[in-house]
Amino acid sequence: MKEDKEKLAISVREAAELLGISVPTAYELARRADFPAFHVGRRTLVDRAGLASWVSAQTGRKS
């Protein structure tokens, strides 16, 4: 069952696509303490709102 609501968390692959980087590079970022990634079982997910804040912090802009 799919919801029309925006997902709160996305896969590392989806994050890579949004950031315009390779999947292996996204997994490297996911291992960093300052990157908004977390684990659910064996899956690594990225907090969508946290990702936007992280990008803003990296570019020196406020969200």
What are the residue ranges of the model-derived segments?
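Residue-level detection of the helix-turn-helix DNA-binding "recognition helix"
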Residues: 31-32, 56
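Short Lys/Arg-enriched helix C-cap and helix-to-coil transition segments
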Residues: 38-44
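A short, Lys/Arg-enriched interface patch at domain edges and termini
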Residues: 51-63
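A detector of low-complexity, intrinsically disordered, Ser/Thr/Gly/Pro/Ala-rich segments
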Residues: 22-23, 42, 57
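Polyanion-binding surface elements
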Residues: 1-29
